[in-house]
Curated annotation (Swiss-Prot):
It comes from Oryza sativa subsp. japonica. Residues 1-44 form a transit peptide. The keyword DNA-binding does not apply. GO terms for biological process: regulation of DNA-templated transcription. This is Protein PEP-RELATED DEVELOPMENT ARRESTED 1 homolog, chloroplastic.
Length: 382
């Protein structure tokens, strides 16, 4: 007679009931207004400088009347697949005899088997539905159900990561590595051709070999994709990606004038230049550090422009002043100051100063701004 641990059986049954009870409901009842932002992973074996396969789509929002019907439909279809996966896991576990001490390992192995044969057929809303169910488990204070669903989610992400190009896998690993020294060691191993790497938690993993320039470009592409949105749903991920890009570029050894880091800008972004001109006018110190920190956290000049999130590209600038109090050069409303673009602007200005051999107090000031910004982002990221 098969023996199924009560706790796991209860968790699976609870998760299934939570899914099946929601799938048949109207969309407005199925979806809670507080749907969390959910990571989407789409891995394409493509050369660098393409849309990066790691992103966090914006939340559906708090107003059900404004939800995108396509996303609602994707959530429903994803929920059906989650229910199917959990049902198959429950069936397999009922046929097994497990010792209590091996429950967690058994769940992981079963999840690997069930998801491994389904990962290529998963709907785009699968991870979205998983995140919604994890949120429901948190709301119900059901830690066992939450842990089970998180195992399923992590297994899906692991399978998708393996299908990514090497430099994409490395970006994901770097975003999960908290210690700066560990990230540098990981980059050195990757540049040397890959091998076994021991992470912050003491676990060993096999890492692929990849080009540092590809890694920096991939992180930069993702930053560009995230920062081009009216709102930033995940500033922690954004901060991690900025750090990954800057550390990969720094390890390449080309310096500020390295042509490999050139995005091809003909002009610098207006919002970032306006903010930088304010910083240069003040002495380095705690007050200046607070200004930078506020903007990096999405306050002051870095605040998301929620009111005009849906405004067209021709929205005019009413009262915004340009550099040194002059009117805006373009006449268009600039985006908020974004961390990745801000550091890019600082680097370009510094590069111009060094190229013209005019380094002095301004260059030292900008170097301080660059290092202080990286320190603040490190604190935000982990």
């Amino acid at each position: 007679m098969a023996i199924l641990p009560l706790s796991i059986s209860h968790s699976l049954t609870s998760a299934l009931s939570a899914t099946s009870s929601g799938i048949g409901r109207p969309v407005a009842r199925l979806l809670h207004p507080r749907v969390p932002s959910r990571p989407t992973v789409i891995c394409l074996a493509a050369p660098p400088k393409v849309p990066v396969p790691i992103a966090s789509p914006a939340s559906l929002g708090d107003d059900p009347s404004k939800w995108d019907p396509a996303e609602c439909d994707a959530l429903l279809r994803g929920g059906e697949q989650v229910a199917s996966v959990l049902q198959e896991m429950l069936k397999l576990m009922e046929d097994m005899e497990m010792d209590g001490s091996f429950e967690s390992l058994a769940v992981e192995l079963i999840a690997q088997g069930v998801i491994g044969k389904r990962v290529d057929e998963m709907e785009s809303g699968f991870l979205m539905a998983l995140d919604y169910m994890i949120q429901l488990a948190e709301k119900d204070s059901d830690n066992e159900r939450k842990s089970l669903l998180e195992v399923v989610k992590q297994t899906v992400l692991d399978h998708l990561t393996k299908k990514c190009p090497p430099h994409v896998q490395v970006v994901g690993l770097l975003c999960q590595t908290e210690k700066k020294d560990s990230r540098h060691e990981l980059l050195r191993r990757v540049a040397a051709g890959g091998g076994v790497f021991k992470n912050d938690k003491g676990l060993k993993c096999q890492i692929p070999g990849a080009n540092l320039n590809d890694i920096a470009n991939q992180a930069d592409d993702l930053l560009e994709s995230m920062e081009s949105r009216p709102t930033i749903p995940d500033r922690k991920l954004l901060a991690r990606l900025v750090i990954v890009r800057e550390e990969a570029r720094n390890m390449m050894g080309g310096g500020l004038l390295d042509e490999r880091n050139d995005r091809g800008f003909t002009t610098l972004p207006e919002a970032e230049v306006n903010f930088l001109s304010k910083l240069v006018a003040l002495k380095p110190g705690k007050a200046l550090e607070r200004m930078i920190k506020d903007v990096m956290q999405g306050k002051a000049e870095g605040a998301d422009n929620i009111e005009n999130a849906n405004a067209g590209p021709d929205s005019k600038l009413n009262h915004l002043t340009g550099i040194s109090g002059r009117g805006s050069v373009t006449g268009l409303k600039p985006r908020p100051v974004r961390p990745g673009m801000f550091l890019e602007t600082v680097s370009k200005v510094l590069g111009g100063i060094y190229a013209n051999n005019t380094s002095g107090i301004t260059a030292q000031h900008l170097e301080w701004v660059h290092q202080t910004t990286l320190k603040i982002l490190q604190e935000m990221a982990f």
